[in-house]
Regions:
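N-terminal signal peptide c-region/cleavage motif recognized by signal peptidases
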Residues: 13-14
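Long, contiguous binding/interaction regions
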Residues: 18-57, 86, 105-123
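Amphipathic, hydrophobic secondary-structure cores in small proteins
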Residues: 76-77, 86-92
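Short proline/glycine- and acidic-rich turn/helix-capping motifs at secondary-structure junctions
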Residues: 90-101
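Short beta-strand-to-loop capping motifs
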Residues: 62-67, 102-106
Length: 123
């Protein structure tokens, strides 16, 4: 009974948060991290991009599965999750040396944001 009461109290008192706006918060990154993210990592990933899949709620980007690209994707995701917290970000590596996939999805409106903000990725 005490556990049930605790669960009910927890559910009632847990604050709900509003969704963040569809805007890149560049201030979430330090000046050095911002330069690295936008001026180095993003262009490097665009150059390595093999394919793009359009999804109903976002996009998937295919990359070669080499270690250097995996490291770039990982570092890019670390920055992107801070400046664009409204993204659902998934990294998937196919078995047997298959492709590396970066998936950006989210709530309604995210796909349109990606189309506008990632125009240089040639969606």
């Amino acid at each position: 009974m005490k556990l049930l009461l605790l669960l009910i109290i927890t559910a009632i008192t847990v604050p709900s948060f509003a969704d963040s706006p569809f805007a890149c918060n560049r201030a979430a990154l330090t000046p050095q991290a911002r330069k690295r993210h936008f001026d180095e990592l993003s262009p490097a990933l665009r150059a390595r991009k093999k394919n793009i899949r359009e999804l109903c709620n976002g996009f998937e980007f295919e990359f070669p599965p080499d270690t250097a690209t995996f490291d770039l994707v990982s570092e890019w995701v670390e920055g992107e999750r801070l400046c664009c917290p409204f993204f659902d970000i998934d990294v998937h590596v196919e078995r047997e040396g298959g492709s590396l996939w970066l998936r950006l999805t989210g709530r309604e409106g995210v796909k349109q944001f990606i189309k506008a903000d990632f125009a240089s990725w040639k969606l």
